[in-house]
UniProtKB/Swiss-Prot annotation:
Region G2 motif, annotated ranges: 178-186
Residues annotated for GTP binding in this entry: S50, G51, K52, S53, T54, S156, L180, R181, R183, N274, K275, D277, A331
Subunit description: G proteins are composed of 3 units; alpha, beta and gamma. The alpha chain contains the guanine nucleotide binding site.
Region G4 motif: start-end pairs: 270-277
Gene from which the chain derives: gnaq
Protein name: Guanine nucleotide-binding protein G(q) subunit alpha
């Protein structure tokens, strides 16, 4: 065999190998494209404390692996910290609102609890357990709790403080409901992918506080659906970042901005009017008309109030061809979210059937 023929043979083998590699790359690109089409990106948006992180936790419970005992144990410290944070917020508000303690000994309990560095809390034992129990039972603190719209207080306060005996027991393991109600402000971006009917739903939760919103921008590509959460109970509350701005007005302004973004022209919009349980409680003593004078419905009527709030948001949509899908939710209620998300999933799949070759 001549040198030329050996070289020609080597070259053709190299060319063959190059073509084989090229074909494999082409095949992989086609697979990637197909797989990307089978992934639906759901962007969870809304102002701070509207319930986005709780919604993601529910997806993990309903469509993922849920929370093992080991996972739940990881929330123990956070539950304790939430309890101290809530009581400290009320102790500070007692001063600001000039509410006296009914029982003199609670001044000492307040001093004790106030001195605690919440971020260092890792256990929950006496004298702190008794101090917090005594404080929570003081009529002054109860009055302060009833006036919580005048300062910042976690929605889970009553839930935890009414259950101190259980939480203070030795070997306490948080329940699923304890985990759902833990409040940890979201900083940065949390993604939760889960598989449903051979489609990957990638849910993206971004921080709702103003300082977090500038990080949203790069999440905006290829968004299938915007899931916007509004806390129905915020109609009489002020912002964490600015105590003279109404939280619901801020939520409306953000919603208006989001639905008019050019990035989202082809994304469906699903509006979750969340915390319906808190609205039902609050509407009995805090009147919607005091904060939204245009409301002309009956007082103490949760149904009328939530329909009015829904209309306020839907009316912000400038595009009459764009449908806004809406659901009233309670993000801490697993069965409610299971039911609502089944409907949402069907809506999203229906809207994307042809594009995703799922028919």
């Amino acid at each position: 065999m001549t040198l030329e023929s050996i070289m020609a043979c080597c070259l053709s083998e190299e060319a063959e190998e190059a073509r084989r590699i090229n074909d494999e790359i082409e095949r992989q690109l086609r697979r990637d494209k197909r797989d990307a089409r089978r992934e639906l990106k759901l962007l969870l948006l809304g102002t701070g404390e509207s319930g986005k992180s709780t919604f993601i936790k529910q997806m993990r419970i309903i469509h993922g692996s849920g929370y093992s005992d080991e996972d739940k144990r990881g929330f123990t410290k956070l539950v304790y910290q939430n309890i101290f944070s809530a009581m400290q917020a009320m102790i500070r508000a007692m001063e600001t609102l000039k509410i006296p303690y009914k029982y003199e000994h609670n001044k000492g309990h307040a001093l004790l609890v106030r001195e605690v560095d919440v971020e260092k809390v890792a256990s929950f034992e006496n004298p702190y357990v008794d101090a917090i129990k005594y404080l929570w039972n003081d009529p002054g603190i109860q009055e302060c709790y009833d006036r919580r719209r005048e300062y910042q207080l976690s929605d889970s306060t009553k839930y935890y403080l009414n259950d101190l005996d259980r939480i203070a027991t030795h070997g306490y393991l948080p329940t699923q409901q304890d985990v759902l109600r833990v409040r940890v402000p979201t900083t940065g971006i949390i993604e939760y992918p889960f598989d449903l009917q051979s489609v990957i739903f990638r849910m993206v939760d971004v921080g709702g506080q103003r300082s977090e919103r500038r990080k949203w921008i790069h999440c905006f590509e290829n968004v299938t659906s915007i899931m916007f959460l509004v806390a129905l109970s915020e109609y009489d509350q002020v912002l964490v970042e600015s105590d003279n701005e109404n939280r619901m007005e801020e939520s409306k302004a953000l919603f208006r901005t989001i639905i008019t973004y050019p990035w989202f022209q082809n994304s469906s919009v699903i509006l979750f009017l969340n915390k319906k349980d808190l609205l039902e409680e609050k509407i009995m003593y805090s009147h919607l008309v005091d904060y939204f004078p245009e409301y002309d419905g009956p007082q103490r009527d949760a149904q009328a109030a939530r329909e009015f709030i829904l209309k306020m948001f839907v009316d912000l949509n400038p595009d009459s061809d764009k449908i806004i899908y809406s659901h009233f939710t309670c993000a801490t209620d697993t069965e409610n979210i299971r039911f609502v998300f089944a409907a949402v999933k069907d809506t999203i799949l229906q809207l994307n059937l042809k594009e995703y070759n799922l028919v």
